[in-house]
């Protein structure tokens, strides 16, 4: 979120995030895991994450994103609302068709925010950048019927925003101890700058087709604190729905302007999802 482009300011607190994911393996008697076990678990769930991302390339889905700036008392003073359908090509390139995008009354949404909407917020980790992260095992949690490994994740080196546009995840992930797949994430994208701050986003996944856990709901509600002491209260809700197996013959589409997808094949009915338990 870009402070300079927002007219109304409010007061507040900053954010501290963290903790991260985890996955498989047996626990030692004290809830501890050996480093070898941790390494095996991380390797297992990151490999599953790569498989999941490849599987997602065979699906189309809908994203309904609402980002609001809030004033005193929590009233909405600005809004960015964008509804889109997405499909991917064989190389994993994303194509977007915008179906609803009224003129935003909140002008603080940056290119980094849009990048995170399609990357870090729903997916957290890029499976091809796993070696860029530190993984710290934080224990196990039980949410409803799921037993979950929990890991805190942080980049080994934070990208320099003056030299690169690369974004990395910092936060926590929850991994099912049976399937060794991520079912929940909580964190944000970095780096941040003096004028660009990002909220901590909590994302839940649901199981589709009895195999992969796809993101279905992301939420954030936070007061962002900037270097000069000014604050901005942000609320974000993103819903991902209508997952359906599909393959589209597409031409390049401008994600910002929302061109039409070409020759998109008919989409069969999506498999019934299994909700992620919420604490």
Task: Enumerate the language-model features and the residues they cover.
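N-terminal secretory signal peptides that target proteins for export/translocation
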Residues: 1-5
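Bacterial N-terminal signal peptides
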Residues: 10-20
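Sec/Tat signal peptide C-region and signal peptidase I cleavage site
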Residues: 21-25
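Structured extracytoplasmic
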Residues: 26-170, 177-184, 188-199, 207-215, ...
